């Protein structure tokens, strides 16, 4: 029951997530006979991961629960402001981790090894691995895991490097691991849906390649690489995204900002109250155009016109907002660049 997504919650409510699930199987080897069964079981877990990854990806882009906010009182004044701190968190982490391209070095100083490492760096530069690494880290920070596909060049399409690097979308890629000690990866999967709504699964094991259309094997061939070419890069053991653990605080921040703007608009658009005087709709609309209202006291009663206002304490609201924001920075390990108690912390010190 713990893996079932609760669809009964309002779309404006914070979604509870606790990292991506590791997909495992108890079979010892992936064969033609069991690949379909293993795939079906793996897809049930992957579908849950995919749903959460889609949510986190949308959240990163700014599609957040506050956009579905509703109000019972004065619904015409309903601000839906996205203060996209999730994007800020991911951008900081990616910039910090990918500031310089990865360079391979060796401990052994022999000339042969040095030349080999130099050649390896040249090949990685030719494949623009630095840009691929940045995409990997971006997915890691958003949804807690990322995938890379490494394949040899197609015949006739050879370039400077004899291989190609691809960053896969974790919404349609996954790796299945063994339940035995060591959790050895048994197969990597990349799938897509065509215009006829048929799902094509590309499945790699260390010895075979299978192409399935739905449940049917339409192609199989030996894997000459001798290894699964799909590699998973989890951000951490729990496969948690960088802002996933502060989703409630991020939604609270959006709510504070939206309510704050509601308070300002409700003061500007306050109701007008008439005490001991009557006025018709036509007269009121005319008075609004003129910018003045004239009333007269009769029969000894005092007539008055005023506004109904409820003032929002901006100081307390700002204190609450700053408290939420500072908690987000502390939990996510990001230095406070706007002053405060953590101004002296560098990115490295906070992360450590």
Whereabouts are the PLM-identified features?
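Extended, regular secondary-structure scaffolds
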Residues: 134-143, 147-239
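Short charge-dense sequence patches
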Residues: 29-40, 61-77, 83, 87-88, ...
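Intrinsically disordered, low-complexity boundary segments flanking structured domains
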Residues: 42-43, 78-79, 83, 129-138, ...
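Extended, helix-rich architectural segments
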Residues: 1-163
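Extended, charged amphipathic alpha-helical segments
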Residues: 218-352
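Intrinsically disordered, low-complexity segments enriched in small/polar residues
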Residues: 17, 34, 60, 93, ...
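Intrinsic disorder/low-complexity detector
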Residues: 70, 74, 81, 86-89, ...
């Amino acid at each position: 029951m713990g893996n079932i997504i609760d669809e009964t919650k309002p779309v404006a409510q914070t979604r509870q997530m606790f990292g991506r699930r590791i997909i495992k199987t108890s079979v010892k080897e992936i064969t033609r006979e069991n690949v379909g069964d293993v795939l079906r079981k793996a897809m049930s877990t992957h579908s849950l991961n995919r749903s959460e990854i889609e949510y986190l990806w949308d959240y990163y882009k700014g599609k957040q629960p506050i956009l579905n906010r509703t109000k019972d009182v004065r619904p015409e004044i309903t601000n839906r402001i996205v203060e996209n701190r999730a994007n800020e968190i991911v951008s900081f982490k990616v910039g910090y981790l990918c500031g310089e391209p990865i360079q391979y070095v060796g401990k052994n100083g022999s000339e042969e090894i040095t030349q080999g490492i130099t050649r390896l760096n040249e090949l990685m530069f030719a494949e623009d691995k630095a840009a691929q690494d940045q995409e990997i880290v971006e997915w890691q920070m958003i949804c807690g895991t990322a995938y890379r596909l490494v394949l040899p060049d197609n015949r006739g399409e050879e370039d400077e490097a004899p291989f190609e690097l691809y960053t896969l979308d974790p919404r349609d890629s996954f790796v299945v691991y063994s339940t035995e000690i060591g959790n050895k990866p048994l197969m990597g999967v990349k799938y897509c849906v065509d215009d006829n709504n048929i799902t094509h699964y590309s499945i790699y094991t260390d010895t075979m390649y299978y192409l399935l259309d739905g449940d049917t094997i339409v192609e199989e061939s030996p894997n000459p690489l001798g290894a699964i070419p799909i590699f998973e890069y989890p951000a951490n053991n729990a496969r948690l995204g960088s802002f996933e653990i502060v989703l409630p605080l991020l939604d609270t921040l959006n709510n504070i900002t939206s309510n704050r703007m509601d308070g300002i608009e409700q003061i500007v658009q306050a109701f007008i109250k008439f005490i001991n005087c009557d006025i018709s709709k036509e007269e009121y609309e005319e008075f609004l155009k003129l910018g003045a209202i004239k009333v007269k006291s009769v029969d000894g009663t005092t007539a008055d016109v005023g506004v109904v206002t409820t003032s929002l304490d901006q100081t307390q609201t700002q204190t609450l907002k700053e408290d939420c924001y500072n908690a987000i920075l502390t939990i996510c390990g990001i230095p406070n660049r706007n002053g405060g108690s953590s101004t002296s912390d560098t990115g490295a010190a906070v992360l450590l």
